[in-house]
Amino acid sequence: MLYGDVGCGKTHMAIATGMLACERGMPVRFFTASSLVMRLRRARDENRLDAELRAIGRARLLVIDELGYLPIDIDGARLLFQAGADSYETRSVISASNPESGRWGDVFGDGDMAAAVIDRIVHHGRILRFHGESYRNKHPLMK
C-alpha cells in the first residue's frame, strides 16, 4: 500500500512499478478504485461478474489507485472486497491511498469490511508512507 499526502508521488510510483512489471512480461491491470467498482457493478448487472473477476485475475499485478478518495457505498465495497479477496495470496496488489487508517470504515461504509481489507493488506504487504509538499503545488503549471 502506497499511503500518504496528496501530490507526493503515490500514483507515479504505482504506474512506474506497473510499467516495469509490463516490461518484464507480467500482465498488469490498473484501475482507480471508483472505475473498478463501476466496472464490477456493470459486470454484475449484465450477469458476467465471474468472467470480469477472472479477467482481472489474469493479471499478476493489480494496481488500484485513489482508494479512499471517494466514499464507496456498501454494495461497491462488497464488490471491491470480492476483487481483493480473489487477489489475496494469488497475485500482487498495489493500492495508493491517503485516508487515515481510522477513516477506512467511512470509506468502505462498513467497519468490519474495512477491517477485513486492512487485515489482508498488512498480512503479506508493506505500507510505504509518502509525505511532504505536493509536487503539483511546488511546480504549478498555472502561475
What are these regions (language model features)?
Residues 1-13:
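Walker A/P-loop nucleotide-binding motif
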